[in-house]
């Protein structure tokens, strides 16, 4: 299925970038901010008018890693080069270029994921020159935190490349904070002296990588609901925009709407030009494609294409129960135009979480267990019949066939006791229903 795509990328198993439907591996305990930083520059090919990306700086060096780890990372670096300059190699030197921040995900063969955070900028200097990319690879999913880190990196880069090392070394040695906590990094800058940089981790860990502002700036509330409907049924969805930062922020925002469920299929927030054949895959995907590639994807008749162009299959407005659609729209109307990122995240996440509470929040009552410690068995039929309304039943019957629900319920079957924010919201909803009945 991906033979053409894989031939372009590798012949050395670096297809890890596009590993297809694999259950997401359990999250590893994160103890540090990042694994390594690379600087990717554009070097002109000899005798040709094109450029090729190349790594000009890395911290820490691969030489400091064990051999097996070094070999794996060398494969990853080939993919990283593509994602730092996804447009390809047809660049011309520039005198002005507004810096932009974007991200991508590296998926390992076992389903575990690492995040690539990028800041692309024009290096300090005179005359026309090619932009360069600073890319941080991390197990941490926290876009806002790394945007602030890049601000500090960029500030030091304008002074000297050598100023980046001590800052990144201090960051690497700092412990990764718990949700809601702050860590302070000391860093020296000539003429400014020692600065203390405070990095605060968001309290809601599943929203660390998310800023919903871009999504709702690009799409209306009604369009967001149509995209959400396509996503919960695991369809093929392509997002298109000119800016890399818009693509990565929109894709991560859409994936976050699924909480407590997790997208289990191909997820590429920015598709490099050489990988554009991925749009022809018959399996579900969430892809971000730059607008100049519109002709390569628009003829895919059963694909939902969003952001700059909205091409839908046609049934999106009928997928979600009508009453719950109205409730979602009402909840989204509660946000203010001048809301902070945190305020908007709260309104949006709670609105969509409430949707799942009302449609599938009764799942635990339909997992039969022979004893407390034994794995349970999910009773699909009784679960579907127990839906509050007929419209919800129709949606639930379709939703339980998705891989994201299947993976979620497998975890429920394995673990007798369930804790977490979703379960807390279910308990609150069930308690409110009891009080209503008692009136």
Protein language model regions, located:
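Acidic, Ser/Thr/Pro/Gly-enriched alpha-helical scaffold modules and adjacent low-complexity linkers
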Residues: 2-439
């Amino acid at each position: 299925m991906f033979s053409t795509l894989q031939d372009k990328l590798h012949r050395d198993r670096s297809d890890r970038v596009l590993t297809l439907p694999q259950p997401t591996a359990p999250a590893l305990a994160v103890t540090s901010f990042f694994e390594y930083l690379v600087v990717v520059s554009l070097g002109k090919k000899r005798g040709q008018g094109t450029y090729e990306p190349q790594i000009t700086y890395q911290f820490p060096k691969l030489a400091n890693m064990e051999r097996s780890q070094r070999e794996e990372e060398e494969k990853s670096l080939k993919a990283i080069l593509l994602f730092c300059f996804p447009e390809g190699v047809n660049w011309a030197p520039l005198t002005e270029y507004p810096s932009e921040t974007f991200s991508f995900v590296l998926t390992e063969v076992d389903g575990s994921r690492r995040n690539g955070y990028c800041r692309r900028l024009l290096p300090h200097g005179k005359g026309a020159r090619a932009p360069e990319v600073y890319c941080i690879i991390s197990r941490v999913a926290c876009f806002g935190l790394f945007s602030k880190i890049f601000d500090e990196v960029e500030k030091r880069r304008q002074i000297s490349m050598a100023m980046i090392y001590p800052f990144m070394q201090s960051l690497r040695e700092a412990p990764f904070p718990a949700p809601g906590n702050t860590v302070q990094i000391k860093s020296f800058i000539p003429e400014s002296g020692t600065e203390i940089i405070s990095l605060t981790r968001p309290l809601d860990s599943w929203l660390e990588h998310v800023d919903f502002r871009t999504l709702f700036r690009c799409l209306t509330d009604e369009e967001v609901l149509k995209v959400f409907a396509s996503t919960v049924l695991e369809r093929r969805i392509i997002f298109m925009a000119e800016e890399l930062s818009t693509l990565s922020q929109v894709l991560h925002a859409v994936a976050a709407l699924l909480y407590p469920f997790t997208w289990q299929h191909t997820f590429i927030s920015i598709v490099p030009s050489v990988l554009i054949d991925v749009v022809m895959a018959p399996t579900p995907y969430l892809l971000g494609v730059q607008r100049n590639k519109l002709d390569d994807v628009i003829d895919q008749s059963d694909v939902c294409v969003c952001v700059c162009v909205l091409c839908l299959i046609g049934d999106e407005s009928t997928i979600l129960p009508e009453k719950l659609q109205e409730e979602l729209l009402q909840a989204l109307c509660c946000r203010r135009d001048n809301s902070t990122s945190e305020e908007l995240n709260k309104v949006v996440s709670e609105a969509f979480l409430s949707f799942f509470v009302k449609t599938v929040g009764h799942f635990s009552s339909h997992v039969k267990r022979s004893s407390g410690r034994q794995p349970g068995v999910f009773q699909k039929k009784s679960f579907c019949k127990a839906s509050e309304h007929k419209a919800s039943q129709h949606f639930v019957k379709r939703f339980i066939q998705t891989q994201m629900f299947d993976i979620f319920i497998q975890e429920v079957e394995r673990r007798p006791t369930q804790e977490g924010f979703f379960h807390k919201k279910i308990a609150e909803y069930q308690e409110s229903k009891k009080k209503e009945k008692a009136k």
